[in-house]
Amino acid sequence: MTTVETPFPATFKPGRAALRLIGSVLVAFGVFLSGFVIDEPAPFDIYMAVLIGFWFILGLKISRTTGLLLAFMLVFMAGGFLSITQMETIGDAPMYLAVTLFLCLSAVFLCAIIDEDHRRLKLIFNAWTAAAVTTAMLGILGYFKAFPGAEMFTRYDRAMGAFQDPNVFGPFLIAPSLYLLHGILTEKISGLPVRAAALGIISLGVLLSFSRAAWAMFAFSAAMMVLLMFIKERSGAFRLKVLIITLG
């Protein structure tokens, strides 16, 4: 007898693979929306709330590692709800707790889907970087009044991109800038021009935000990352590359 080879492994399920791909794309789009918070609730808030709900309904897997994070978040939220009972005037406390709960659920959700497929982490960072470059460009164009109405992307002559506050805009750009810097130092030289251009745009956005906290975060985190990579990597060629790029 002869055996017939199938084009897919026995464990491969095209339907499930398609759903996973669609889910990953939807998550990436949600992360991209995080760079646009002109008004509240922001598109990111509504989109992620719906996405998290659907994903939980369809069966989001919570591993032990993610479950530990969820447990800590629940304890943290319980403390917040208990603190309300000690307040004479509740005021806006319920709204702050609701926002905190949403952020906690978002953190657990992202950890869970990354734990399920680690490749999603790179996808998330790529989407975050795309959002950072886009909103940084808006902030830069607004600062230089590049077109009529561009001032809407500034406040008090400070770039704020598609955010409500320059002090939120600046810190949002830090992680993508580190991601690009790490790629410049570790990835192939062919991708250097694109990464360098994106890093330049984001760096200018951080500068024009005139956020001292963002400046300090950018300088300290970049210096620490380069230093740790320099110490960890034993290759002389890599260390030379780090020195050349850093000094350049």
Where are the model-predicted features located?
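Transmembrane signal-anchor hairpin modules in multi-pass inner-membrane enzymes, especially those
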Residues: 1-95, 112-129, 183-193, 234-247
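Membrane-embedded alpha-helical segments of multi-pass membrane proteins
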Residues: 40-57, 97-107, 169-177, 216-223
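Alpha-helical transmembrane segments of multi-pass inner-membrane proteins
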Residues: 52, 122-154, 161-232, 236, ...
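Non-cytosolic membrane-interface motifs at loop->transmembrane helix junctions
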Residues: 92-99, 155-160
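Residue-level signal for short amphipathic helical patches enriched in basic/charged
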Residues: 101, 116, 210
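Short, flexible active-site loop motifs that bind/organize anionic cofactors or intermediates
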Residues: 111-114, 159, 205
